[in-house]
A protein has these predicted regions:
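Short, acidic, metal-binding catalytic loop of nucleotide-sugar glycosyltransferases
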Residues: 22-31
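Glycine-rich, basic loop-to-helix element that forms the pyrophosphate-binding segment
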Residues: 64-80
Length: 336
């Protein structure tokens, strides 16, 4: 059995996927690389097949009709044979030295008395044109170099476990029944959220492993693109609220963390709807909150009357301008 399966969702990725694959090949035979061609119309399929032919014991090319990023991740999970599972997007890459430490740590932990559910590491925002590179690290929030549970997690505002920082135990993803929606962007938030109640122990390795590229005009996190795809963001937001509502929490620290994560996602949805500047968008914002209220009144009050929730719902045009201005300041300060 391979130690780590890595899925690379690819859609028309010919311009950058090779850099991603080459960075992952440094893992050698301990790693299984699943290149998922999600119905591409460029040379993505050809490149995937060429790598699979050259490295038959490491790389597997998977071809499917276009189903979106989530379905590509689903295909990766279905085909993974490794003990652990990670997603690396085709325009991103990993640091070689950190990669070696990740594999060494996973190997050592598999020989230990406990089965590890999730390994956490740092990621770096590789933002094009940025004066500094922001590192998302967790050294003041999580114990370092030891196995721990949710009671040891103390996340501050602005700190979240994103897809880029997470490696799950593969069987855990099967056990929790994770199935990401098709033809929907922003499902990485569901990937980093829904399985958490099944995670009983974690390990934090303080290395800058994942390099998260930001800068392509067509990238899903581009603000203008997000506004155009706001219905998909709202869909993910609602699915996260559903997951929270249906969860039977056995840790107050886990509940607090997941509530905080849902709070920031709801705020991002609100920001984009306000930035859209249309009455239709404002109606969608109201409808999203109403959906949560009908599903879970307790959750609605927690989100609507949090600090972020109050800011997102300041009355009138002036209130909306203040909200957007505050967002721009945070965006510049935090580097996202």
């Amino acid at each position: 059995m391979k130690l780590l399966s890595i899925a690379i969702p690819c859609y028309n990725s010919e311009a950058y996927m090779e850099k991603c694959i080459e960075s992952l090949l440094k893992g050698g035979e301990e790693v299984e690389i699943l290149v998922v061609n999600d119905g591409s119309s460029d040379r993505t399929a050809e490149i995937a097949d060429a790598y699979a032919e050259k490295y038959p014991t490491i790389i597997k090319a998977i071809h499917q009709e276009n189903g979106g990023h989530g379905e590509a991740v689903n295909a990766g999970i279905r085909n993974a044979t490794g003990l652990y599972f990670k997603v690396v997007d085709s325009d991103d890459w990993v640091n070689e030295e950190a990669y070696k430490q990740i594999l060494k740590t996973l190997e050592e932990l598999t020989r230990g008395p406990k089965t590890l559910d999730m390994l956490i590491s740092n990621f770096v925002y590789e933002k094009q044109g940025a004066s500094r590179k922001k590192v998302m690290q967790y050294r003041h929030c999580l114990p370092v170099n030891e196995i721990f549970g949710w009671d040891s997690v103390h996340m501050s505002k602005g700190k979240y476990l994103l897809m880029h920082s997470i490696i799950y135990r593969t069987k855990l993803l099967h056990e929790c029944g994770l199935e990401l929606p098709k033809h929907t962007f922003y499902v990485d938030n569901l990937f980093a959220f829904e399985p958490l109640p099944f995670v009983k122990n974690m390990y934090y390795l303080d290395v800058n492993f994942y390099r998260y590229f930001i800068g392509r005009d067509d990238q899903s996190v581009n603000e203008n693109v997000m506004i155009k795809r706001i219905d998909q963001q709202i869909r993910v937001n609602k699915l996260m609220a559903d997951a929270f509502h249906n969860c039977q929490f056995d840790s107050k620290h886990l509940k607090k963390y997941m509530l905080s994560y849902l709070d920031i996602i709801t705020t991002v949805s609100s920001i984009m709807l306000v930035r859209a500047g249309t009455q239709e968008a404002l109606d969608k914002k109201k409808e999203m909150l109403e959906y949560i209220r009908e599903q879970d009144l307790w959750l609605y009050h927690k989100l609507r009357y949090s600090i972020l929730g109050r800011a997102a719902n300041l009355p009138g045009r002036g209130g909306r301008k203040m909200f957007v201005a505050a967002y721009k300041v945070c965006q510049k300060f935090y580097g996202f």
